[in-house]
Amino acid sequence: MIWHVQNENFILDSTRIFMKAFHLLLFHGSFIFPECILIFGLILLLMIDSTSDQKDIPWLYFISSTSLVMSITALLFRWREEPMISFSGNFQTNNFNEIFQFLILLCSTLCIPLSVEYIECTEMAITEFLLFVLTATLGGMFLCGANDLITIFVAPESFSLCSYLLSGYTKRDVRSNEATTKYLLMGGASSSILVHGFSWLYGSSGGEIELQEIVNGLINTQMYNSPGISIALISITVGIGFKLSPAPSHQWTPDVYEGSPTPVVAFLSVTSKVAASASATRIFDIPFYFSSNEWHLLLEILAILSMILGNLIAITQTSMKRMLAYSSIGQIGYVIIGIIVGDSNDGYASMITYMLFYISMNLGTFARIVSFGLRTGTDNIRDYAGLYTKDPFLALSSALCLLSLGGLPPLAGFFGKLHLFWCGWQAGLYFLVSIGLLTSVVSIYYYLKIIKLLMTGRNQEITPHVRNYRRSLLRSNNSIELSMIVCVIASTIPGISMNPIIAIAQDTLF
């Protein structure tokens, strides 16, 4: 009898919870419509995989890509709407958040065609790979719109868990297992430190979890200049630093880049930084409004260390993926300049513009690594010597993306860096911008060294890998070439396109 009553109570409680969740989704679902499209795509993938055979594999790619494109379309239709807070203050919708969501969706959309031939050649499980990519994308999108401490913690954990699984996707590869172990351990440690910082914010504000309410709580409790806020600032900086991977939080980056499947590295190298940058701008700018001098100093130190260490160590690398890992550490130092400048002097606009160009430059370079690696089985820099003689399109595309990463005119990377450094200079960050300029010159050296190898035509310098290079392993490699063409075009946009891009980015401020 007692068990029967308890069972009825459990059913009633479950029904109430379900009805409350349904009520929230019904009245607030329009605010997360792009995310709902991805959720529907995930469900559809699972249904097709459980009821289909190998002949339906192209449908899996089609559904994944279509759901991403539809989500981008939904975001564009919602552009310029009034900022709204939904789900009882957990989620905020505004142009600033949406442009970061757009960047994450763009990364995922380009990474899926980048992965098709790699998955077929390595015989990886397709459905799970696509599920993890879409779920990580979903976590990144929720992180961009997160408006309270709980969502800011749960959303990146969703992204991180999928990242751990993707990085160890090739289970038989010892390097992949090692990379995943390091990634998982350091990710768990950084998450615990992040939660520790959140607990100090929660306690100091009198039990508030929404970002703006935390500010009001700190004013009411007079704790905005307390030692607890300093502890919270340091802890949260360390936690977010793991996602951004600036020095000295970069130890996991080279190993994960080298050991993980190349399409996974391409995906993680851009999406994690976009999502973490969106979260960092809101966390530092709102709850730590009264500690702006302190977090500016912290980020300046991280930016300087990242730009110097990342670019100097990249010179010594022999693996293409490890070189790009250290290059990305230097690149995040440039992005941090935009975070420090903030609203004033178009700091966020310059950061968003540079990140858009960085996505195209980085993914274009990784498309070349995927294509070359599938045909030669190597990512050693020396093995690229003479590639121009066998595949001029691949060599020229690689050269353009690398030159744009280095910031040479008239490519997109040059104008992106120029605008970013100019905003930093106007904000009085003279030393930081000077370091950025010097390290950019250093980066040009190792990019040009690779381009020289690509373009060499002397027989004695052409490696056996290039001599035995085959144009295509499969019937067609159009999917990789499609991503590469899009990225190369975006990486070589002349300066005439900068003004409309910056104008759009300026509309995304809070």
From Swiss-Prot:
It holds the Pfam family Proton_antipo_M. GO terms for cellular component: chloroplast thylakoid membrane. Its EC number is 7.1.1.-. The gene is ndhB1. NDH is composed of at least 16 different subunits, 5 of which are encoded in the nucleus. The chain crosses the membrane at residues 24-44, 57-77, 99-119, 124-144, 183-203, 227-247, 295-315, 323-343, 347-367, 395-415, 418-438, 484-504. It catalyses: a plastoquinone + NADH + (n+1) H(+)(in) = a plastoquinol + NAD(+) + n H(+)(out); a plastoquinone + NADPH + (n+1) H(+)(in) = a plastoquinol + NADP(+) + n H(+)(out). Belongs to the complex I subunit 2 family. Keywords: Chloroplast, Membrane, NAD, NADP, Plastid, Plastoquinone, Quinone, Thylakoid, Translocase, Transmembrane, Transmembrane helix, Transport. This is NAD(P)H-quinone oxidoreductase subunit 2 A, chloroplastic. The lineage of its organism: Eukaryota, Viridiplantae, Streptophyta, Embryophyta, Tracheophyta. NDH shuttles electrons from NAD(P)H:plastoquinone, via FMN and iron-sulfur (Fe-S) centers, to quinones in the photosynthetic chain and possibly in a chloroplast respiratory chain. The immediate electron acceptor for the enzyme in this species is believed to be plastoquinone. Couples the redox reaction to proton translocation, and thus conserves the redox energy in a proton gradient. GO terms for biological process: ATP synthesis coupled electron transport; photosynthesis, light reaction. The keyword Transferase does not apply. NCBIfam families: NDH_I_N, PRK02504.1. It is found in: Plastid, Chloroplast thylakoid membrane. It is a multi-pass membrane protein. Its main location: plastid. GO terms for molecular function: NADH dehydrogenase (ubiquinone) activity; quinone binding.
